[in-house]
């Protein structure tokens, strides 16, 4: 007699789990590395490119959509990619630049929620269940995030919106590039019923072959399959698959380590240069910084506050001073000091930050963040 798996979930439990509704957004940048290169070098925008280094040795990290038309994809050997597309332009990766852009994207996310789970430099889960902006509509929030990314960074992102993580991730891929797909709580059952099992995260090539051998191709097939038999045949994975096929995913958005700083920043579509222009931006950013800080430090207690400037040549400078409480007037001196390093360069980004660490030495700190 089969011993019932302790992880088994009955129908009543499924209903109970579905009753806990969350608003999850999965944001996935469109061919991120390649998009950054095309943004920064207009000569690359109308040709097939791959991020891979200059030689035929190695593998493709990512490629743009023009290259994908030739059948090129990530993890493909570069030599094979060149056979498919002899005029493919190989671009060496600039990981430091990608990390900086990823931080800018993260800063946009943080305007809406602190519940952010990065999966890589170019994708993340956001839980916006408690966000009151845009009437609390996850659909409108996702649209606004994508608009901000495009307006401020000249990059596009796709998004999936759903009550659970795995459906949000699947949905983000359905209207690529530069689109989004929403699965409402009412649509979950029909969505997963028609979902091909290979689209479920964690279902690989070997597993899908075994599922096909059992006559399991879409979520509906699993819904109609004997649950105990599924657990016998696939163990813990069978439990997970059965839950996913019923639209259940109890995983929460995992927030990173305890916050050590709070910051806001803006990248401009047109560079600026004067103190008056910069201070106007600071005045726009400050209320957002204060609001976000109050969520973690209601009394506005801090260890330091700083200003970051990024110039038109992509070099950046940061000035930070020790302060016990957030003080808007201190940003005047910080901004002036940062602008002494301008050297006639225009400014493309301004950031404000506060550090929450304690026990810092009473001295000026000046470094990138």
List each language-model region with its residue ranges.
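DNA-contacting surface of Y-family translesion DNA polymerases
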Residues: 17, 26, 212-349, 357-362
């Amino acid at each position: 007699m089969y011993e019932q798996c302790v992880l088994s979930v009955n129908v009543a439990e499924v209903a109970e789990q579905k009753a806990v509704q969350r608003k999850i957004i999965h944001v996935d940048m469109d061919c991120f590395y390649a998009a950054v290169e095309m943004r920064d070098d207009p000569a690359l925008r109308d040709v097939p490119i791959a991020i891979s280094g200059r030689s035929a040795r190695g593998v493709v990290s990512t490629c743009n959509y023009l290259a994908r038309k030739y059948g090129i994809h990530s993890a493909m050997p570069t030599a094979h990619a060149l056979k498919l597309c002899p005029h493919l332009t190989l671009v060496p990766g600039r990981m430091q630049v990608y990390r900086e852009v990823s931080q800018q994207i993260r800063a946009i996310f943080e305007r809406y929620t602190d519940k952010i789970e990065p999966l890589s430099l170019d994708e993340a889960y956001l839980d916006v269940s408690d966000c009151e902006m845009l009437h609390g509509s996850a659909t409108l929030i996702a649209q606004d995030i994508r608009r901000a990314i495009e307006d401020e960074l000249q990059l596009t992102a796709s998004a999936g919106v759903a009550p659970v993580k795995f459906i949000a991730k699947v949905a983000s891929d359905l209207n690529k590039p530069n689109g989004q797909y929403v699965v409402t709580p009412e649509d979950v059952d029909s969505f997963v019923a028609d979902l091909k099992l290979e689209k479920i995260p964690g279902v690989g090539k070997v597993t899908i072959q075994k599922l096909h051998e059992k006559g399991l191709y879409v979520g509906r097939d699993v819904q109609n399959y004997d649950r105990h038999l599924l657990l016998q045949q696939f163990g813990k994975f069978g439990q997970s698959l059965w839950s996913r096929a019923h639209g259940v995913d109890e995983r929460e958005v995992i927030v990173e380590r305890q916050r050590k700083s709070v910051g806001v920043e803006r990248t401009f579509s047109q560079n600026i240069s004067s103190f008056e222009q910069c201070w106007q931006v600071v005045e726009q950013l400050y209320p957002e910084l204060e609001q976000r800080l109050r969520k973690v430090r209601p009394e506005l207690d801090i260890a330091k506050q700083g200003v970051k400037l990024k110039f038109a040549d992509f070099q950046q400078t940061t000035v930070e001073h020790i302060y016990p409480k957030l003080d808007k007037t201190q940003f005047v001196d910080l901004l002036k000091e940062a602008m002494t390093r301008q050297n006639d360069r225009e400014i493309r980004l301004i950031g404000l930050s506060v550090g929450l660490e304690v026990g810092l030495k009473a001295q000026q700190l000046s470094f990138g963040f």
